[in-house]
């Protein structure tokens, strides 16, 4: 197995120069970089990442921490993070958080393993968590965190404006009897923690902003919602299996002409039940979702949805986090922009 000394000898440079090229820790001429990289390739040299971490005080590892591996929303985000990490020479590791205990274990692991940075997604990270991580050398970024934080880079979806956009799409197509399927809005106080499934404690901010956007756009058109229906579970797979709620939405006496669903899995569940009952879409009920999951475009009729740039969110947050780790930028708050993708359901 080749060593760093072998690389230095083959390239005709010092071991220190090879180390500087590998770690990008100092200015080295282009000629030196080319010679070292050629020697590395010829010898099939693989740097010792543990030793590299000790030398540079960086492990070149980024953690992506989220709360529901079964939710397809996270796949494109993780791909964006993964590709950005690979581009910059970092490795991504995943944590699927399913309990408060698991969250605390995750925080300890991030510190113990000297992870350079972490992206928390759709969680309720608190300021004390951030302060603890940063004091131990872990940089922090978030996507759609429940509360605003200091000392982090935040990438957030434009949930309020996107919901208005979805509602305006329905109104512009002549629909007036419009309803909404929203999520639960329990108080986020600490005494409520542990009383419900851990995952259900999060994403309240998202649902509130989407509902507020829907209601404000309806009011701007001098319209009142036909119905405001609260989804069950976590507004994903659990709701899709809740036949009672679906049948209540689609009952002839309650059925709106159009329905804004606050995520795509709810929308696909409503679409599936409509097709099962023989209800014509969009002739008898129009449906628009929110998020832009690939599933919606694979089916027929194709789901009309507000598409969030999920891959771009992941790529953006990872690049900004790595820049922070490498002291190339300060923390910032960034809002992404969604767009309506018209399918066959409106």
What are these regions (language model features)?
Residues 2-5, 57-172, 251-254:
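Alpha-helical recognition/docking segments in bacterial nutrient-uptake
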Residues 42, 83-93, 134-142, 146-346:
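Bacterial carbohydrate/catabolite-sensing allosteric modules
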Residues 49, 75-76, 105, 272, ...:
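Generic recognition of short, well-ordered alpha-helical segments
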Residues 1-59:
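N-terminal helix-turn-helix DNA-binding module of bacterial transcription factors
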Residues 42-48, 99-102, 122-123, 271:
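Short gly/ser/thr-rich secondary-structure transition/capping motifs
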Residues 17-20, 54-70, 177-200:
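Short beta-strand segments enriched in small/hydrophobic residues
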């Amino acid at each position: 197995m080749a060593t760093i000394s072998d690389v230095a000898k083959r390239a005709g440079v010092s071991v220190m120069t090879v180390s500087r090229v590998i770690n990008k820790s100092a200015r080295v001429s282009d000629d030196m970089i080319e010679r070292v990289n050629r020697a590395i390739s010829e010898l099939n040299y693989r740097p010792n990442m543990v030793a590299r971490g000790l030398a540079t005080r960086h492990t070149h590892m980024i953690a992506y921490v989220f709360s529901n591996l079964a939710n397809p929303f996270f796949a494109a985000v993780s791909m964006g993070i993964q590709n950005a990490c690979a581009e910059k020479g970092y490795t991504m590791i995943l944590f699927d958080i399913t309990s408060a205990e698991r969250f605390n274990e995750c925080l300890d692991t991030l510190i113990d393993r000297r992870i350079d940075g972490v992206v928390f997604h759709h969680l309720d990270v608190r300021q004390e968590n951030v302060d603890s991580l940063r004091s131990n050398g872990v940089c922090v970024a978030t996507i759609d965190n429940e509360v605003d934080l200091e000392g982090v880079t935040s990438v957030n979806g434009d949930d309020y404006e996107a919901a208005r956009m979805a509602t305006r799409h329905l109104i512009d197509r002549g629909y007036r009897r419009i309803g909404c399927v929203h999520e639960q809005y329990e108080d986020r106080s600490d005494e409520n923690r542990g009383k419900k499934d851990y995952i259900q404690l999060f994403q309240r901010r998202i649902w509130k902003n989407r509902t507020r956007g829907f209601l404000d756009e309806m009011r701007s058109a001098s319209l009142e919602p036909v119905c405001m229906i609260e989804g069950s579970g976590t507004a994903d797979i659990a709701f899709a299996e809740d036949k009672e709620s679906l049948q209540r939405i689609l009952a002839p006496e309650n059925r709106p002409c159009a329905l804004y669903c606050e995520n795509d899995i709810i929308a696909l569940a409503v679409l599936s039940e409509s097709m099962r009952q023989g209800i014509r879409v969009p002739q008898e009920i129009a449906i628009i979702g929110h998020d832009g999951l690939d599933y919606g475009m694979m089916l027929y009729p194709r789901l009309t949805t507000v598409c969030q740039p999920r891959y771009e969110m992941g790529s953006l947050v990872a690049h900004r986090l790595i820049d922070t780790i490498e002291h190339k930028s300060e923390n910032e708050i960034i809002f992404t922009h969604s767009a309506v993708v018209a399918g066959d359901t409106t």
